[in-house]
């Protein structure tokens, strides 16, 4: 792996893994959807972008809204993906927005801050005295890899390259 690959988050499949058809890769990515995970993978056509698929946190879905509201999540995160069958790769562009919870019935409001490219975010919250021995106890953890990790794993197991995009088009 070269320096540029490290900067972009590009990952290649293990040697000997046969590449699968684009339809199979897309179906495998969509197969990650489950009511038990805090993210959703959907068709990217509705975004008006060149993405084939978009993965994002389920911030506004009623079943997950309480969780995200309780943790006062301050960022929301999306991964735009385009499948490139002729190269056997999934090109991925991250997008992160700062958000605020507003109103009596809290709702999400996007702020003016956002990031595009390859985003790595880790947030943790602890409470003091929460552990059995009076030590600090982690009460909340958010890691952008909790969303990207499963996506990358499916792509690599399908024999395709995960190519991170820093700027420009997918």
Descriptions of predicted regions:
Residues 1-170:
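A composition-biased, non-transmembrane "mature-region" signal
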């Amino acid at each position: 792996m070269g320096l540029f690959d490290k900067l972009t988050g590009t990952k290649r499949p293990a040697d000997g893994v046969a590449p699968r058809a684009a339809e199979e890769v897309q179906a495998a990515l969509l197969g990650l959807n489950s009511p038990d995970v805090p993210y959703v993978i959907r068709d990217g056509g509705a975004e008006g972008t060149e993405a084939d698929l978009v993965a994002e946190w389920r911030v506004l879905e009623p079943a997950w809204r309480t969780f995200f509201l309780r943790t006062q999540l301050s960022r929301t995160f999306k991964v735009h993906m385009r499948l490139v069958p002729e190269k056997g790769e999934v090109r991925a562009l991250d997008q992160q927005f700062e958000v605020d919870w507003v109103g009596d019935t809290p709702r999400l409001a996007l702020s003016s801050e956002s990031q595009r490219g390859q985003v790595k975010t880790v947030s943790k919250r602890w409470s003091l005295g929460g552990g059995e021995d009076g030590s600090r106890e982690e009460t909340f953890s958010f890691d952008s890899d909790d969303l990207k990790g499963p996506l990358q794993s499916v792509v690599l197991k399908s024999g395709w390259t995960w190519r991170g995009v820093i700027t420009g088009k997918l």
